[in-house]
């Protein structure tokens, strides 16, 4: 029986945002191949019960509370890594002799104690954290948060450079991250994001509205939405639906002030899929250059046209499946153009996505690398 420790930066259920979607569907796909998963989760608060969806795909689940000491911001270690430190985790790892897969650099603070442990060490590199925090700093309006994010970006630069060489293999999400890791060390492997979609939806030629969906607590998504709202103010003939269950009062006011824009909550995954299936086109904009965003896969598998800017993906094959705008003027033109078009890309997407981006194929690749003997 092949066994694997997975150390997650959070409890991976429900799989409701980018990084956690990758973690959950990776576990699901590895479990489906017969890998025995020992899951370790850093959490704000230990849950009272473990969801059946997690129990069914894991052998064990362990929880560790993140440290709540604000003085850790003054540590030389990135704050996200400093708060994820646990002696109990080390003891649990030693009880079961199996390779360890760290989900993101924020889970790697304990690696300093594992050098001579005999465990094979692997990293799922979720983001270039240096660029991620730099992007957060640029998008953030609050001056205090802007400074904190900038400092964290600088911390990550040194931390990343020092740590990446310590792993047997670093599994990268995107071409950009793959090229960056190769600069530091020769242990990079490109494994695209796990997304949970299995087949491309067969949809008719027209949808009913344009859709913007995302977590509106992040500065990047808020900035993207405000730009999109301003765009649709100039396009009163088109309806925009904003789907999010985390909209601030300020965002709600901005939406309600524009007649052709409405806000709807994302209650469940099924609810989101229903919104995607009825959309004519999706607006995906980001100001952070951090590889392919997981919501791109959700829209390509489950909806019609997808209008993107350059930061949504660095994969030319995926870009070719979308309508691209380099700036908001070009995005506006793509909205107008797509509104008049019939959607007929089902077969093209099926051919590309189901062959080159299936979760099963990616899990098989990971298994071949980790369990090569």
Regions found by a protein language model. Name each.
Residues 193-254, 263-273, 277:
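Conserved catalytic-core segment of nucleotide-activated headgroup transferases in glycan assembly
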Residues 68-76, 122-155:
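Acceptor-binding helix/loop patch of EC 2.4 sugar-transfer enzymes
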Residues 168, 276-291, 304-305:
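Acidic donor-binding loop of glycosyltransferase active sites
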Residues 1-59, 95, 233-235:
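N-terminal subdomain of nucleotide-sugar transferases
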Residues 90-109, 120-122:
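Short N-terminal targeting/anchoring amphipathic segment
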């Amino acid at each position: 029986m092949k066994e694997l420790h997975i150390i997650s930066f959070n409890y991976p259920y429900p799989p409701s945002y980018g990084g956690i979607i990758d973690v959950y569907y990776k576990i699901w796909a590895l479990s489906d191949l017969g890998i025995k998963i020992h899951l370790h989760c850093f959490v704000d608060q230990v849950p009272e019960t473990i969801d059946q969806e997690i129990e069914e795909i894991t052998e064990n689940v362990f929880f560790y509370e993140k440290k709540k000491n604000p003085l850790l911001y003054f540590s030389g270690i990135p704050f996200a890594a400093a708060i994820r430190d646990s002696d109990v985790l080390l003891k649990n790892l030693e009880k079961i002799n199996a390779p360890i897969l760290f989900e993101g650099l924020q889970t790697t603070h304990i690696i300093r104690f594992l050098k001579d442990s005999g465990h094979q060490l692997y990293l799922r590199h979720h983001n270039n954290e240096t660029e991620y925090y730099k992007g957060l700093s640029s998008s953030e309006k609050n001056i205090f948060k802007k400074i904190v994010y900038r400092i964290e970006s600088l911390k990550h630069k040194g931390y990343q450079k020092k740590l990446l060489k310590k792993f047997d293999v670093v599994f990268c999400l995107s071409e950009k991250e793959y090229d960056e890791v190769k600069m530091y060390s020769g242990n990079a492997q490109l494994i695209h994001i796990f997304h949970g979609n299995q087949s491309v939806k067969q949809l008719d030629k027209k949808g009913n509205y344009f859709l913007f969906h995302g977590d509106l607590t992040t500065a990047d998504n808020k900035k993207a939405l405000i730009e999109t709202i301003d765009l649709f103010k100039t396009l009163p003939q088109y309806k925009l639906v904003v789907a999010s269950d985390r909209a601030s009062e300020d965002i709600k006011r901005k939406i309600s002030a524009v007649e052709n824009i409405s806000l709807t909550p994302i209650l469940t995954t099924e609810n989101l899929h229903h919104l995607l299936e009825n959309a004519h086109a999706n607006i995906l904009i980001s100001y952070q250059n951090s590889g392919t965003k997981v919501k791109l896969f959700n829209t390509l598998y489950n909806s019609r046209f997808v209008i993107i800017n350059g930061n949504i993906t660095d994969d030319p094959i995926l870009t070719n499946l979308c309508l691209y705008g380099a700036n908001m003027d070009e995005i506006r033109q793509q909205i107008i153009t797509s509104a008049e078009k019939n959607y007929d890309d089902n077969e093209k997407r099926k051919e590309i996505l189901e062959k080159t981006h299936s979760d099963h194929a990616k899990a098989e690749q990971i298994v071949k690398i980790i369990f090569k003997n």
